[in-house]
Amino acid sequence: MRLRLICVGQKMPDWVSAGYNDYARRMPPELPLELTEIPMAHRGKNPDISRLMQRESDAILSAAGTRDRVVALEVGGRPWSTEKLASQLENWQQDGRDVAFLVGGPDGLADACRQRADQQWSLSPLTLPHPLVRILLAEQLYRAWTITRNHPYHRA
């Protein structure tokens, strides 16, 4: 089983790549965390936002496998505690399908991504910068895995 983070945006600052890579490297070989970056649609003067979101969402959905369990990261999604995420992770591992986490661009995910999602998850009611979401998600997935293994990283 693989955990796949599918994000809109490329050419992240070095600190973002370093933070994400640090946690991705910590994941065990049987549960790799992979990143797929989708180019952000160009937003010039007076852009047609719905058209740009649709273009980004088409690319996101084509990157997600047809059998993947899809989790859309959405402000309107359900909030999960770290312990709930650990429980989800155990369930996903038993299911065996890859899990694709969808992160939209600056305007979010189009309806097609939300409709394809098996679950919608809200990391926070705050608006988070998309580069930070990569690090936060990677850390929380690593933390959830450590909980399932009684690893001392998580001390709640």
From Swiss-Prot:
The gene is rlmH. PANTHER family: METHYLTRANSFERASE (PTHR33603), RIBOSOMAL RNA LARGE SUBUNIT METHYLTRANSFERASE H (PTHR33603:SF1). Transmembrane segments: none annotated. GO terms for molecular function: rRNA (pseudouridine-N3-)-methyltransferase activity. This is Ribosomal RNA large subunit methyltransferase H. Its EC number is 2.1.1.177. Keywords: Cytoplasm, Methyltransferase, rRNA processing, S-adenosyl-L-methionine, Transferase. InterPro entries: Alpha/beta_knot_MTases (IPR029028), RlmH-like (IPR003742), tRNA_m1G_MTases_N (IPR029026). Specifically methylates the pseudouridine at position 1915 (m3Psi1915) in 23S rRNA.
